[in-house]
Every structure is written in structure tokens, then in C-alpha cells.
Amino acid sequence: WYINQYDGKVPYEDMFFEELIPYMEKTYRIRSDKESRAIAGLSMGGYGSFLYSLHHPDMFCACAPLSAAVFDDTVMEARKARSHKDLFNRLFGPGDEHWKQNNVLKILSDWDQNNLPKIRYYIDCGDDDGLLDGNMQVHQIMRQKGIRHEFRVRDGGHSWTYWRTALPEVLKFVSQTFCRS
């Protein structure tokens, strides 16, 4: 899920920022400034891209989550008690603290109006995708907060057939964001 596991056993987010990005910058001829870096992902990776952009707003100029796995507290509680119980308890722990620190909706809702992230967002989710409600909640919070974003709901579900049609638009959006910087 691209987060640091609550018990510290799997520090995925730390690894991404402390090891992977420095390795990429050292190994390849890439620019290391925020204006030249975007993040995108689909499903669980969409959640990760949202989260990384919110935890590290100084690192990215654009974020493009597709069909992001964003859940509110009620969905999360239901999932902890059902089929995904082992997974979610392993990631977020038995309490709510780690969940709150990694809840995209809560982070956005709590964001200081005077210190909004200077990141352009492109959010895309299919109308038949079970994750649409969470993505719509993100859109509503962003509108209320005045966070710049594009929000697309198109015909389709949670599948590569859907995402393949979104990727050209995502690349265009990221390219335009780089050009503006």
C-alpha cells in the first residue's frame, strides 16, 4: 500500500523517498527539482500517489491517481472486520492512529487553507468502479478547499481496459504541468 507499516517492519514510504528517489537521481540523468517530478498510480498505486503528494508536497508538481483506493472511515472499519481484516490490521494496526495519518480524505480535510499543496492533480475513475465513491469524496473536498485539480468520471470499471484509455490524457496533463513550471 506504499505506506510505512504501523509497526515499522516494512518502511515502504521511507524507502521510496530515502532510497529509490536518490538512487534514480544518482544513476540517471534526471532533474531533481519539484517542477520536474510527477507521481501517478492506479488503484492501490493511486492511493500511494495521493498519499505521497500529501505527505511530501515539496517533491511533486503533479499527481495523477487513477481509480485510487481511497476509503472513508466507515468503509475502512467494515473492511477491517471482513475479508481484508488481516491485510488492513497488518498495515494500519489495531487502533486508528496510523490509519488517520494515512487517510487521504482526513489529510485533505485537515489541510490548512493557507498552506494548500501547490500540486496539480488529475483524478480519473470509472463510473462502474467500486472505488468511485472515495474518489468523488476527494474531488468534493478539493473543490471546497480550492485545490486545483482535474476530475474525470468516464464509462468503465476497475480494469486495464479502462486505465489504458486514461494514460494518454495523464501523460498529456503531466507534460503540460512540466511546461508550466
Q: Residue locations for each model-derived region?
A:
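Non-catalytic cap/lid and distal C-terminal segments of serine-dependent acyl enzymes
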Residues: 1-181
